[in-house]
């Protein structure tokens, strides 16, 4: 049986279930547990992008639209001239 699983190319069910659970937990925590989630996301995104590009922190806008079944995260970063 183990030999068949080796060649089947399918993931084992435990890692897939764990990944799905982590996604659900992250989504639930964002909906009810962290009032400053957008601020935290903005700061982390700003830190990552700032490693590669010098930019004005005031020109980074993060928005989250939450629907019943889907949440959307939008990030607008104004880059200096010559980089786009």
From Swiss-Prot:
Gene3D superfamilies with a match to the protein in the record: Cell division topological specificity factor MinE
SUPFAM superfamilies reported for this sequence: Cell division protein MinE topological specificity domain
Disulfide bridges in this chain: none
Origin: domain of life: Bacteria
Key word Disulfide bond present: no
GO annotation, biological process: cell division; regulation of division septum assembly
UniProt keyword list: Cell cycle, Cell division
Pfam family, one: MinE
Known function: Prevents the cell division inhibition by proteins MinC and MinD at internal division sites while permitting inhibition at polar sites. This ensures cell division at the proper site by restricting the formation of a division septum at the midpoint of the long axis of the cell.
Entry similarity comment: Belongs to the MinE family.
Name of the protein in its database record: Cell division topological specificity factor
Protein species of origin: Rhodopseudomonas palustris (strain BisA53)
């Amino acid at each position: 049986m183990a030999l068949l699983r080796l060649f089947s190319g399918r993931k084992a069910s435990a890692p897939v279930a764990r990944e799905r659970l982590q996604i659900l937990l992250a989504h639930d925590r964002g909906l009810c547990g962290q009032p400053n989630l957008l601020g935290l996301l903005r700061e982390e995104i700003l830190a990552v992008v700032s490693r590669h590009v010098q930019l004005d922190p005031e020109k980074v806008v993060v928005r989250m639209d939450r629907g019943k079944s889907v949440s959307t995260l939008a990030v607008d970063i104004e880059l200096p001239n010559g980089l786009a």
